[in-house]
A protein has these predicted regions:
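Active-site beta-strand/loop architecture of penicillin-binding DD-peptidases
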Residues: 1-29, 46-124
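Extended C-terminal subregions enriched in glycine
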Residues: 33-47
């Protein structure tokens, strides 16, 4: 979204029993903390993580994926939680996913494949 920060909301739509929309949330812009040029650089880096870096297990040739892997050590034995945060897009349809696996080790080997399954399910 070119660096535009959006107002978060929890409910996209409220429908009645017949499936009619009673209320629908509308996206609202909050601020623009990044310039478009800065956002473009970040997107290239996040794309590279998935295409040739630590997040390759979230890569797909069917849609475009961007992401970042990580791990967070939680004790002196250097055991870690695994995480992946990313987004994917295809034909104007977009999804953002955050995966955290407690005691999962590496984000690339544990969390990224879970995100891949979510992306695959979303795009069909």
């Amino acid at each position: 979204n070119d660096g535009v920060m959006m107002q978060p909301y929890l409910v996209d739509q409220v429908k009645n029993i017949d499936g009619g929309v009673i209320k629908e949330s509308e996206p609202e812009e909050m601020a623009s903390p990044l310039k478009k040029s800065e956002c473009d650089v970040l997107k290239k880096m996040l794309r590279k993580v998935v295409s040739s870096g630590t997040g390759t297990k979230a890569y797909s040739s069917e849609y475009t994926v961007y992401g970042k892997t990580g791990s967070a050590e939680y004790n002196d034995d250097k055991d870690s939680h695994a995480w992946f945060i990313g987004c994917a897009e295809k034909d104007g349809k977009k999804i953002v996913v955050s995966v955290l696996v407690e005691d999962g080790g590496s984000g690339g080997s544990t969390a990224a494949p879970i995100a891949d399954k979510v992306f695959h399910s979303f795009f069909g």
